[in-house]
């Protein structure tokens, strides 16, 4: 049930009937304060200006023509021409009843699209670190949200599995196998990479062999490809452990590494030349873009092939977009890559559009994000200044959550305690990130993220347990609630209306890739339930009808909190 869309349609019809152009915008929004109703239509002022009318006069005409029979109990004009809409409580109650039993909480089915989501993208032969966290969990929240709405979502893990460094890595893997030390060395990928680089820098014979292996690998040598595949498989097996711990939906089947596009690169360079988009410049192949100027004010040159014949990341990204449209059939392509890559992507996509590889009707969207910072405002590091491994971060999260949860639940069975600790610890790290606007940097703070109050995962998980505990104490389930829902109190109405806004919220998150909007909604919902719980008797209500009615509100609250947290990849628990 998308109330905002329903009211927008109704107000737009009234505006058009009042003389507004067909493309007018009703600008219906959720009201910030209860005194302004549940929704407010703000589009009258802009339309009145176009029509040369007084806004208040147009607002009065719109209200006369606005048919909200059975939907609104009252419509008021405020200020110069704001239209305040107060929803009818019986109508709200009926919609809550529907959401309680309907599939997906009553969220209307969408026309499904094929949507490719590019996220995570770790490098082969390197351990995942905190720098991979944001792309991985924000991208996965987008995937979960889009899938919930009914879209065909293709997860694309654009793994860094190609490049000149693989000659060095293959040579070092070979060296270790000859020394029967393969398993030991690859158990710590970071150490493996560092030792390979050290050997490359210090041993000229090793360096020559490494450079030879680069050429062999790129020409399809079977031995080199086997060694390369082993490196990829070992890396992705270790990454899968991290994905599973994070409750992220990526698997090995979602890997679409840089190597996937190798065969396309020569064809793309040739095609761009044939179309007159690429030219030779000092031995390299370059595309000049008028949209981007260099320091001299001239079109910026984007190299797609070096003079030694090598290709660049831009070339791969052009091929990647082409593949996702032509082969995967994408209707929309989302990239969860940090903000530092924005210009690079924009240049690649400019070439993609000019070449006609992806039509303008298929959006290419860079859902960029900022950095995770330490309390000092600098990039988050270890105390010694090193990169924080993702596995170490998650270990510490679980350890800290363990102290918090075990202290409050001394009698909880060990298996349940372990599950709760893991859900709270991992959830705290994820929610702290997801609850911030992805476009900004944020400060990583253990105390804040594990707090049991405020907009945190532990608070949200506790809020859920508080709701479900009502049903344990009542000894009822959904099927036993047979009496109709009635709304008589303001706090009931506020909670019920907010519950019905779930579809508006999840639609916004799907459109804009903004999981913090879902976090804010769930936090607000938990607060409204808390106020309702404290002021409206549930189990000891004055009548069985009111008791069941309030239990239904509690039931939909539990379902909405659980579903909302699930779209974020945050696990709920029954007790805390």
Curated annotation (Swiss-Prot):
Its recorded reaction(s) are: tRNA(Arg) + L-arginine + ATP = L-arginyl-tRNA(Arg) + AMP + diphosphate
* Localisation: Cytoplasm
Coiled-coil segments, which residues?
Answer: none
Under CDD domains, the record lists: Anticodon_Ia_Arg, ArgRS_core
Q: Which top-level group of life is the source organism from?
A: Bacteria
Q: What Gene Ontology biological process does one annotation of this record name?
A: arginyl-tRNA aminoacylation
Name of the gene this protein is made from: argS
Motif 'HIGH' region is found at 122-132
What this protein is called in its record is: Arginine--tRNA ligase
Q: Which UniProt keywords apply?
A: Aminoacyl-tRNA synthetase, ATP-binding, Cytoplasm, Ligase, Nucleotide-binding, Protein biosynthesis
Subunit: Monomer.
Q: Which family does it belong to?
A: Belongs to the class-I aminoacyl-tRNA synthetase family.
Q: What is its EC number?
A: 6.1.1.19
Q: Which organism is it from?
A: Yersinia pseudotuberculosis serotype O:1b (strain IP 31758)
Molecular function terms, GO-annotated: arginine-tRNA ligase activity; ATP binding
Q: What cellular-component terms does GO give this entry?
A: cytoplasm
């Amino acid at each position: 049930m998308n109330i905002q869309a329903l009211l927008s349609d109704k107000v737009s019809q009234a505006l058009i009937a009042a003389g507004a152009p067909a493309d007018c915008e009703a600008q219906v929004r959720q009201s910030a304060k209860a005194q302004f109703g549940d929704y407010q239509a703000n589009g009258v002022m802009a339309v009145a200006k176009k029509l040369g009318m007084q806004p208040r006069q147009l607002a009065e005409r719109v209200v006369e023509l606005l048919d909200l029979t059975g939907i609104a109990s009252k419509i008021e004009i405020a200020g110069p021409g704001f239209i305040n809409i107060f929803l009818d409580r019986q109508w709200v109650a009926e919609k809550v009843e529907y959401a309680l039993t309907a599939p997906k909480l009553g969220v209307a089915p969408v026309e499904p699209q094929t949507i490719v989501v590019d996220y995570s993208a770790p490098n082969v032969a390197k351990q995942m670190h905190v720098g991979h966290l944001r792309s991985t969990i924000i991208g996965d929240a987008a995937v979960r949200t889009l899938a919930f709405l009914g879209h065909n979502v293709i997860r694309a893990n654009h793994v860094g599995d190609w490049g000149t460094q693989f000659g060095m890595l293959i040579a070092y893997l070979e060296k270790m196998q000859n020394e029967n030390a393969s398993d030991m060395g690859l158990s710590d990928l970071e150490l493996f990479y560092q030792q390979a680089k050290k050997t490359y820098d210090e041993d000229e014979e090793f360096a020559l062999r490494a450079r030879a292996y680069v050429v062999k690998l790129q020409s399809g040598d079977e031995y080199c490809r086997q060694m390369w595949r082993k490196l990829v498989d070992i890396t992705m097996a270790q990454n899968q452990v991290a994905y599973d711990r994070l409750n992220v939906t990526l698997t090995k089947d979602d890997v679409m590494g840089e190597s996937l596009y190798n065969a396309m690169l020569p064809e793309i360079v040739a095609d761009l030349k044939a179309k007159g988009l690429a030219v030779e410049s000092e031995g390299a192949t370059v595309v000049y873009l008028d949209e981007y100027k260099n320091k001299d004010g001239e079109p910026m040159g984007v190299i797609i092939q070096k003079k030694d014949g090598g290709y660049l990341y831009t070339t791969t990204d052009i091929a990647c977009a082409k593949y996702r449209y032509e082969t995967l059939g994408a209707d929309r392509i989302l990239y969860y890559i940090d903000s530092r890559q924005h210009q690079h992507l924009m240049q690649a996509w400019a070439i993609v559009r000019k070449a006609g590889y992806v039509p303008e009707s298929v959006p290419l969207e860079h859902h960029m994000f900022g950095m995770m910072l330490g309390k000092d405002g600098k990039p988050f590091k270890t105390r010694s200044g090193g990169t924080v491994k993702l596995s170490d971060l998650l270990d510490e999260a679980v350890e800290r959550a363990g102290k918090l949860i075990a202290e409050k639940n001394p009698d909880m069975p060990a298996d349940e305690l372990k599950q709760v600790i893991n859900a709270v610890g991992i959830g705290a790290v994820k929610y702290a990130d997801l609850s911030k606007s992805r476009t900004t940097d944020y400060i990583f703070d253990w105390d804040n993220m594990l707090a049991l109050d405020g907009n945190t995962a532990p608070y949200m998980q506790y809020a859920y347990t508080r709701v479900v505990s009502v049903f344990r104490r009542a000894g009822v389930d959904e099927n036993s609630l047979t009496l109709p829902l009635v709304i008589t109190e303001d706090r009931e109405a506020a909670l019920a209306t907010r519950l019905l806004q779930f579809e508006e919220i999840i639609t916004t998150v799907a459109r804009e890739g903004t999981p913090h909007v879902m976090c804010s909604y769930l936090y607000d919902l938990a607060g409204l339930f808390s106020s309702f719980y404290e002021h409206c008797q549930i189990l000891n209500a004055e009548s069985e009808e009111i008791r069941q009615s309030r239990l239904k509100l509690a039931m939909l609250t539990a379902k909405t909190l659980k579903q909302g947290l699930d779209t974020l990849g945050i696990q709920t628990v029954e007790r805390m």
